[in-house]
Curated annotation (Swiss-Prot):
The lineage of its organism: Bacteria, Bacillati, Actinomycetota, Actinomycetes, Mycobacteriales. Involved in peptide bond synthesis. Stimulates efficient translation and peptide-bond synthesis on native or reconstituted 70S ribosomes in vitro. Probably functions indirectly by altering the affinity of the ribosome for aminoacyl-tRNA, thus increasing their reactivity as acceptors for peptidyl transferase. This is Elongation factor P. GO terms for cellular component: cytoplasm. It comes from the Bacteria. Keywords: Cytoplasm, Elongation factor, Protein biosynthesis. Belongs to the elongation factor P family. Signal peptide: none annotated. InterPro entries: Elong-fact-P_C, NA-bd_OB-fold, Rib_uL2_dom2, Transl_elong_fac_P/YeiP, Transl_elong_KOW-like, Transl_elong_P/YeiP_cen, Transl_elong_P/YeiP_CS, Transl_elongation_fac_P. It is found in: Cytoplasm. It comes from Mycolicibacterium vanbaalenii (strain DSM 7251 / JCM 13017 / BCRC 16820 / KCTC 9966 / NRRL B-24157 / PYR-1) (Mycobacterium vanbaalenii). GO terms for biological process: peptide biosynthetic process. NCBIfam families: efp (TIGR00038), PRK00529.1 (NF001810). Pfam families: EFP, EFP_N, Elong-fact-P_C. SUPFAM superfamilies: Nucleic acid-binding proteins, Translation proteins SH3-like domain.
Length: 187
């Protein structure tokens, strides 16, 4: 059990038998009336996001989530195989559980896998990943009909928007949460 004062991003709550992760929260103290907490909760199984409001000080049920360091090994059909960094046990995760993270996975990449009652819940990549541009069109100097970006395909097959000066073979820093371009990696 935890109070609303214990809320933090990433905390997993158990509500009506389902697991929900706090994505965002805000303590609100209005001029009139009692304080309350607005939260944005994400269902760890389905990915559905809902807004929920709690009165300040209310106790809620928390779930015990064990985050373990692992390394991505290879893809086996529709499964992604990871090796636990502590006991070297291999964990095959289905494509549905890996989700959008598959766009940024490289072999030997360190990740974290969250477990609840021995079964994997979700996968966490490092916030930034370094990937090489596999292909992109050359950016033309006078071509400014767009906002100064062009599509680029990364070595993992993911397609992101990059500035016009990026070329095939450049190593980029990419935000793994939303696939946004963060910068070039200096060689």
């Amino acid at each position: 059990m935890a109070s609303t004062a214990d809320f933090k991003n990433g905390l997993v709550l158990q509500i009506d038998g389902q697991l929900w992760q706090i994505v965002e929260f805000q303590h609100v103290k209005p001029g009139k009336g009692p304080a309350f907490v607005r939260t944005k909760l994400k269902n760890v199984v389905s990915g559905k996001v809902v807004d929920k409001t709690y009165n300040a000080g209310v106790k809620v049920e928390t779930a015990t989530v064990d985050r373990r360091d692992a390394t991505y090994l290879y893809r086996d059909g529709s499964d992604f195989v990871f090796m636990d960094s502590e006991d070297y046990e291999q964990h095959p995760l289905p494509e549905a559980l890996v989700g959008r993270a598959a766009d940024f996975l490289l072999e030997s990449m360190p990740v974290q896998i969250a477990f609840h009652d021995g079964s994997p819940l979700y996968l966490e990549l490092p916030v930034t990943v370094e990937l090489v541009v596999a292909s992109t069109e050359p950016g033309l100097q006078g071509d400014r009909s767009s906002a100064g970006t062009k599509p680029a395909t990364l070595e993992t097959g993911a397609e992101i928007q990059v500035p016009l000066f990026i070329n095939t073979g450049d190593k980029l820093k990419v935000d793994s949460r939303d696939g946004s371009y963060l910068g070039r990696v200096n060689a």
